[in-house]
Amino acid sequence: MNMQWVGASMMLLIPVLFFLGSLTNERRANWNLASAISLLGLFLSMFLGIAVYFEWVNLSISGQWVGVSKMSLVMLGLVCFIAFVNVRYSSAYMAGNVDEEKRYLRWLMVTLGCVVTVIISNHMLVLMVAWIAISLSLHRLLVFFPNRQRAVLAAHKKFIFARVAEACLLGAILILYYEHGTWFISDIYQNVSLSTSLTTLDQFAAMLLALAALVKCAQLPLHGWLIQVVEAPTPVSALLHAGIINLGGYLLIIFAPLIVLSDMAQWILLIVGGITTVLAALVMMTRTSVKVRLAWSTMSQMGLMLVECALGLFELALLHLVAHSCYKAYAFLNAGSEVESSMKRRLSRAVAPSVKEWWFAGIMSAAMVVGLIWLADLSGPYSPWLLFAIAVTLLIAERRGRLTSSSVIGMVGLGVVLLVVYTLQKNGASLIVSSMETSVGWKGDLWIGFLLVMFMVGYFLLRYHSEHIWMRKVRRAFYAGFYLDEWVTRLNLRIYPTRLPVRFKPKKLQVPKEELFQ
């Protein structure tokens, strides 16, 4: 028996089960079946991972509609795990709404089936159809509460932006088929890997892929819908932030050889993704709503993931994708408990580190990172190590935080542990997806380094000098996201207007006095 076909059949079984599960909710929502399908998908992906490790399944065979690869297996296991947790949470969240939970579970299972189809597809047309289907089915979940104006407006904007991303992806797919004469992603990956340069059409296809990823990941200025969809049910937000919005990064990873040979695609990702990373992180510091803060955090994290892809650090992008998905699923599903802890942090007074503490933290973090680079003889882009050094600097300098106070030795030790764990995880991810040398070189490193320095300046001003008169206008601008979404929304509604639900206004409700005082 051909184990390659067995593995492909097992992977194909997972989306089929999700689609069939969406059809079993005519009388009542079958939550147990949905949980069982998600759990079965997780077990099948784990079994296939073991089969690949022991070489029972050959990964080198191309020309199949279903792609069995290490990358697809990791993503498949991740999506099925998120699906299982989401379904279990949703069963309690939607309890008591008999008619609504049937509709909710039906579209949830369809969305999950489409996401899995994108992940396992090795055929570009199948990928395209499933990519479109994700957007359409997710739209039904985003407008689950059709009487909420913000939710309807966000879904409307997302609907338009999704069409833009799909147009870019379709253009890239047609160009790649014209250039390489095949619809299979694995064949294109192999052909481009053997090349040292791209044709003009391939360059254009890489640019379209980069634009599709930027729009899919809600990068500035097409980001507003991601902030406003928090009006949707909480598990929908968790699914969106943990398993759907990061598909832009997945798209770049599966077309990695094409991206690293295109200077224009890399610089588009570096500029837009880098600016989004810094601005979204600073805007997040000014917001008070837990869900809105998480949404801005997702924008920043997606921007950083796209920057990693532009620098050729695809193993780091994969690690980032998996870690972000697990964290955001937990954060959104635990948003209710986060409100209390967030309130405590805001009510407690932060102790500003002294100049000596900042110098000590900076020297210690720099020594850790430089020592590791020297001992392990590491090469490649150094801006990620600069980012890690900044994170450890903040960890050590702000050890006397809002709620807790830790010793210097403890924080330095924690920094060393984080550095070791990060290095081990990065090396582990390189066994699945390897990094590639890009043409941006030191220029890309310099650009990201400049943005990180600007982030530190903004962080210091917003955190420790936000009460100054001259900082209030700056903070107000950050809080509003520099009004970028307002301009985009106006343009959006002018080009493609929509009718929003009418709000219920009790003050204008005319009630006769006889009925009012009965």
UniProtKB/Swiss-Prot annotation:
Keyword Membrane: yes
Record note on disruption phenotype: Cells do not grow in low DIC levels, increased carboxysome content. Decreased ability to accumulate and fix DIC under DIC-limiting conditions.
Quaternary structure annotation from Swiss-Prot or TrEMBL: Forms a complex with DabA.
The family this protein is said to belong to: Belongs to the inorganic carbon transporter (TC 9.A.2) DabB family.
Protein name: Probable inorganic carbon transporter subunit DabB
Broad class of the protein's primary localization: membrane
Annotated PANTHER family: INORGANIC CARBON TRANSPORTER SUBUNIT DABB-RELATED, NADH-UBIQUINONE OXIDOREDUCTASE CHAIN 5
Membrane topology of this protein: Multi-pass membrane protein
Native organism: Hydrogenovibrio crunogenus (strain DSM 25203 / XCL-2) (Thiomicrospira crunogena)
Protein location: Cell inner membrane
An individual GO BP term: electron transport coupled proton transport
Keyword terms: Cell inner membrane, Cell membrane, Membrane, Transmembrane, Transmembrane helix, Transport
Domain of life according to the entry: Bacteria
